Amino acid sequence: MASDGDGAAAVAALGISGGGGDDWAPPLRRNLPLLAPHEVKLAKLLLSEGQSHLFEHWPEPGVDDDKKRNFFDQVCRLNSSYPGGLASYIQNARKLLADSKAGKNPYDGFSPSVPSGEVLTFGDDNFVSLEEAGVKEARHAAFVLVAGGLGERLGYKGIKVALPRETTTGKCFLQHYIESILALQEASCKLVEGECNTKIPFVIMTSDDTNALTVKLLESNSYFGMEPSQVHILKQEKVACLADNDARLALDPNDKYKIQTKPHGHGDVHALLYSSGLLEQWKSTGRKWVLFFQDTNGLLFNAIPSALGVSATKGYNVNSLAVPRKAKEAIGGITKLTHVDGRTMVINVEYNQLDPLLRATGHPDGDANCETGYSPYPGNINQLILEIGPYMEELQKTHGAISEFVNPKYTDSTKTAFKSSTRLECMMQDYPKTLPPSAKVGFTVMDAWLTYAPVKNNPEDSAKVPKGNPYHSATSGEMAIYRANSLILRKAGAQIADPVIDTFNGQEVEVWPRITWIPRWGLIFKDVKAKVHSNSSVSQRSALVINGKNITIQGLSLDGTLIVNAKDEAKFNVTGHIENKGWTIQHVDHKDTSEKEEIRIRGFKFNKVEQLELNY
């Protein structure tokens, strides 16, 4: 403990003018002898930013001293994890809260227009050549998964990446992502003359909620075949909550020595990458691209090769992956914004802001479908491809700070008080907001059936979705995988039966044959086309599982369930008529607690009556 003399020196060191000495935060002043010099500096920072209320309840020295020190440990973490420190956070909050109270529109002065980008058609010559270009570039890429969320919104208590992507094989999202990256790594290396030892880096951004469970999932599954040195875990910290319009920090209702915190959003990934030193390491080893993606879109790797091919051939510094979007659909639209002062940016504009923005800037119909039947503003699916050189240059200026927003819930129309504390938030896809007009920012559009099936809504909420709108549930997410794989095989020439319509957990969906394959088998369409011949057919009630890189399908007539396993480079041709009782689909009520959560949230399970399993 410091002496009284040290305490007096500490008081003097605070140097707060205008009400210094005994007049400011007396409870803190009495406790200054407890504090180390760096904690005194943090105290000064808090007082300078109008946060003396944090100390009003502090008792005399000797009472709760450890809790007081823990308080400053937390303040130190909050200060070090935010670009510019806690003072910047409070100042930014004050400005954004004032703008919110005044009803200021962040898009004032901006006019929207349709940005330039690429619209791809699955399976045509252009698509195939872009996929091949993307595979060639993959060895120069690094992948970043933002996975800070639990599955509570889904009705699942675990981490979202541990959720089965589909239940035919039971493989979780994280396994599929890693196997897809490894397949890209292998295919890309094969295009290099001579030896290629490239290991594609994979970063996972976690949070306090998901970190330990993510590490456990990786370690208990031997990293799903990836070398542990390829995987980097970056944990994001939460940010301080704000109690009022003056940006006074909120204390935890259950602990008066702790500042209440909440997640800052997945925009933190940029600051974490900047501070980690990984970008410099990657650039020095020849990386050109950083690919960002979110945690539960089971189709996203269908889009990666061709989109990476677009980035490489078009020279995009930023490439946002997108899907065709119906006007007013509840998904953000990628939009070019031009300010009256000449500034331009290409960013995601949320759907509830896009329509009024268009109406206010000379588009009387607002967000309307064009002759294609879709809005000209494509739907953002939160997958970004950034060119590493310009990305690093931008982060040198911003240190990874991303344009923030605040969304307080006010008690009434005066906007003077909050119903509960709020905080600043930021989104990964808002990175382009700070880019200069010279930046080459574009997008790549692909059909949603091929690339977009997020799993984010629970059964109750999904059942309320109007008919015809996407459910974005575990039910629709799994069925979308079977639909995509069936349509890919159809395009390759196989005869795949039409789906039937069924309802699970109140959601009406198409049920296609349950077809799955490992990424090494069908990484790009050219691979699939080379392995599937037109004289093969699969009935609607069938399930086909392909576990092997060099399995070909020729003259197969499947009516039932077939699982084909081939080790490593073993080659095998699947042929002939195969019929068995197969796997039937059994309805499951989402309230049936006798079933596992991951089954209940889907509303179905497979009754494995009969199957043929071939091993080579």
Swiss-Prot record:
Gene3D superfamilies, alphabetized: 2.160.10.30, Spore Coat Polysaccharide Biosynthesis Protein SpsA, Chain A (3.90.550.10)
GO cellular component, one term: cytosol
EC numbers for this chain: 2.7.7.64
GO terms for biological process, alphabetical: pollen development; UDP-alpha-D-glucose metabolic process; UDP-D-galactose metabolic process; UDP-glucuronate metabolic process; UDP-L-arabinose metabolic process; UDP-N-acetylglucosamine biosynthetic process
Reaction it catalyzes: a monosaccharide 1-phosphate + UTP + H(+) = a UDP-monosaccharide + diphosphate
Pfam families reported in the protein's UniProt record: UDPGP
InterPro entries: Nucleotide-diphossugar_trans, UDP-sugar_pyrophosphorylase, UDPGP_fam
GO molecular function: glucuronate-1-phosphate uridylyltransferase activity; UDP-N-acetylglucosamine diphosphorylase activity; UTP:arabinose-1-phosphate uridylyltransferase activity; UTP:galactose-1-phosphate uridylyltransferase activity; UTP:glucose-1-phosphate uridylyltransferase activity; UTP:xylose-1-phosphate uridylyltransferase activity
Cofactor: Mg(2+); Mn(2+)
Domain of life: Eukaryota
Keywords linked to the UniProt accession: Nucleotidyltransferase, Transferase
Function: May function as the terminal enzyme of the myo-inositol oxidation (MIO) pathway. May also play a role in the salvage pathway for synthesis of nucleotide sugars.
PANTHER family noted in UniProt: UDP- GLUCOSE PYROPHOSPHORYLASE, UDP-SUGAR PYROPHOSPHORYLASE
UniProt record similarity statement: Belongs to the USP family.
The protein's name: UDP-sugar pyrophosphorylase
Organism in which the protein naturally occurs: Oryza sativa subsp. japonica
Lineage, uppermost ranks: Eukaryota, Viridiplantae, Streptophyta, Embryophyta, Tracheophyta
